[in-house]
Amino acid sequence: IVEMSVAGGNYGYALMWVIVVAVAMRYVFVSLIAKYQLCNPHGEGVLDGLSRLHWLYAPFLMVSAIVMGHVYESYVTVGIGEAFVNLFGRGTVWGWAALWNGVALAIVFRPVYGHVERVFKGLLVLLTLSFLGTALWVGPSPSGIFRGTLAFALPDQVGQFSPLLITIGMLGAIGGSLLNLVYPYFLEDKGWTQPKHRRVQTYDFLLAMVVMIVLDLSVWTLGAELLHAQGLQIATMDDLPRLLSEVLGRAGRTLFYVGIFAVLFTSVVGFAMGLARMASHGLLRWRAGS
């Protein structure tokens, strides 16, 4: 959401081609990972297959999962704190962050987490529908989207964030990152472990891709039409709620922060569980001699 907001708000539709490349990268990477996980003749996971190619993959991915797990959790933690400070206007970033990390730790291994997760998913659906409805109300520019999709060029820098930085951020966040290698563990959680599950996995992944694309394009449109068209820019986190508050008023600002909190809180749990499993898998494979 942040990447799309800044891209649309600061550069209009000029970087639209980046999201096309990023989505294509994500589809290729995740599809290859899922196909190997479900259909390889050895009945092994992706990390196991990489470890058979070279023994260093196991310790490398173990260390990478630990390091990047701390990096991911750090910025998500800060995001939670900033969301609550901006929403309520009181407290400190680290105070709120510590509180909600404590809540996550307390409930993640208890049956109650499933119910909490469903509530947050409901909030995410509400946020997505709000972005989509507001974007349709504002109205995207088909010609601007078309030109931006075919541009394949970086515009001059506007504001604090260079177009190259935004491009790298989108390619990493959407296209390819270490988190793609966590996907097989969530397939196992769903019980999808055999070639016969390939079809349902593909449908599930395509649905997730469609939802992601709709959300990204909605946020991008709001940034381009509400902010960029008026010469406004996104410089701080408190500029982001204007994507909804320009149309929905104060309720839009509140909805934005509540939705962002839902995204970040579920990410705290998801990153911790997924990357921890990758790290432990890498350790076990390394100790077994790959």
What are these model-derived regions, one by one?
Residues 1-25, 32, 235-240:
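Transmembrane helix-boundary motif of multi-pass solute transporters/channels
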Residues 2-6, 115, 178-211, 229-241:
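Hydrophobic, small-residue-rich membrane helices and short re-entrant helix-turn-helix hairpins
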Residues 18-50, 60-72:
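Juxtamembrane transmembrane-helix boundary signature
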Residues 27-39, 187, 210-239:
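Extracellular/periplasmic helix-exit of transmembrane alpha-helices
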Residues 39, 57-89, 264-283:
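Hydrophobic transmembrane alpha-helices that form the core helical bundles
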Residues 54-67, 99-100, 158-171, 213-214, ...:
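Select transmembrane alpha-helical segments in multipass membrane proteins
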Residues 62-63, 87-109, 125-136, 287-290:
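Transmembrane alpha-helical segments of multi-pass small-molecule transport proteins
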Residues 125-157, 164-185:
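Hydrophobic alpha-helical segments and their helix-loop junctions in multi-pass secondary transporters
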